[in-house]
C-alpha cells in the first residue's frame, strides 16, 4: 500500500512539473528599428541579429521588475549615434510590437567631435555676415572656436556655445580666457534636442549632421527673428533648401561646403 502511494505521488509530480515549467511563457517582442545593423539591448542584454524587424523572446522578469527595457542604437554616419529606448509592461500579452523607428522625447543623439578648421570658421562667419550687432550661437560647440572666432575676429556682440560634453564646455571656457573674450561669451552644457527657443540668436552656426539639423529645423524656423542667419558646415536640412552654398578648398587642401539660410518674415495665421 505504501509503495503504491509513493508511486502515485511520484507520477503526480511527473505530470505536474512539466505544466509548471511550461506554464511561464516567454513574452515575444517584434522590435522595429530604422537600420538593419542597429544594436538591440533588452533588459541590459545585447541581442544578436540583423534586420529592421526582429522577433525577440524575452526571458522571465527579475523579481520586482515592472517593465522590460528595450534599447536600440545605430550610427547613420560617421558623426552621429542615435539611441532610443522603450518600456514594455511586464504583464503585456505577446506578441508586442516595439517601434523604435520613430523619435520620442527619450531619444539621445551623440555627435562625434570633429573640429571645424579655423579657415572654414572664418568663411562661415563671412557667409553669415557677422557684425558687432550680432549674438552668435553655436549648437554643438566642441572647443568653442566658432563663437570665440565670431567675437574676436568679427566683433560679434555676444557668443553662446552649447554642448552635451562637459569636458568640451570646460575646454571652451579655457579657450575663451586664452583669447581674452571670456566676458563676451557663454558656454553651457545642454542637449541640442532639448533646445526650445533660439530667439536670442541672430546668427546660428552648425556642424551637427543632417539628422540633427532636421530636428533643429522647426525650432530655428519658429523662434529665430526675421533676418536671422543660419550657417551650416557641410550638412543640410532636408527639403528646406539653403539660399546660398559656397564650396571652396581649405588651407589643408580639402574641399568644404557651407550653407546659408535666412529667416524670412513670419506669417500671421
What spans do the regions from the language model cover?
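Conserved class I S-adenosyl-L-methionine
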Residues: 133-142
Amino acid at each position: 500500500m505504501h509503495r503504491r502511494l509513493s508511486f502515485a505521488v511520484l507520477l503526480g509530480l511527473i505530470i505536474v512539473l512539466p505544466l509548471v515549467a511550461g506554464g511561464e511563457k516567454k513574452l515575444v517582442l517584434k522590435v522595429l528599428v530604422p537600420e538593419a545593423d542597429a544594436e538591440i539591448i533588452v533588459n541590459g542584454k545585447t541581442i544578436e541579429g540583423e534586420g529592421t524587424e526582429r522577433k525577440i523572446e524575452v526571458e522571465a522578469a527579475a523579481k520586482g521588475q515592472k517593465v522590460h527595457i528595450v534599447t536600440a542604437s545605430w550610427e547613420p554616419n560617421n558623426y552621429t549615434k542615435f539611441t532610443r529606448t522603450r518600456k514594455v509592461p511586464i504583464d503585456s500579452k505577446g506578441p508586442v510590437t516595439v517601434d523604435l523607428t520613430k523619435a520620442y522625447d527619450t531619444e539621445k543623439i551623440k555627435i562625434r567631435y570633429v573640429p571645424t578648421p579655423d579657415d572654414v570658421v572664418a568663411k562661415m562667419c563671412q557667409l553669415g555676415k557677422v557684425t558687432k550687432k550680432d549674438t552668435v550661437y553655436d549648437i554643438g560647440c566642441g572647443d568653442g572656436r566658432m563663437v570665440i572666432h565670431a567675437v574676436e575676429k568679427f566683433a560679434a556682440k555676444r557668443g553662446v556655445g552649447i554642448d552635451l560634453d562637459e569636458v568640451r564646455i570646460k575646454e571652451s571656457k579655457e579657450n575663451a580666457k586664452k583669447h581674452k573674450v571670456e566676458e563676451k561669451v557663454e558656454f553651457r552644457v545642454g542637449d541640442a534636442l532639448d533646445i526650445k527657443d533660439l530667439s536670442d540668436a541672430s546668427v546660428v552656426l552648425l556642424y551637427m549632421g543632417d539628422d540633427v539639423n532636421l530636428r533643429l529645423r522647426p525650432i530655428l524656423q519658429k523662434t529665430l527673428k526675421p533676418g536671422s542667419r543660419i550657417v551650416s558646415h557641410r550638412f543640410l536640412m532636408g527639403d528646406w533648401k539653403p539660399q546660398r552654398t559656397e564650396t571652396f578648398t581649405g588651407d589643408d587642401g580639402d574641399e568644404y561646403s557651407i550653407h546659408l539660410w535666412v529667416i524670412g518674415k513670419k506669417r500671421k495665421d
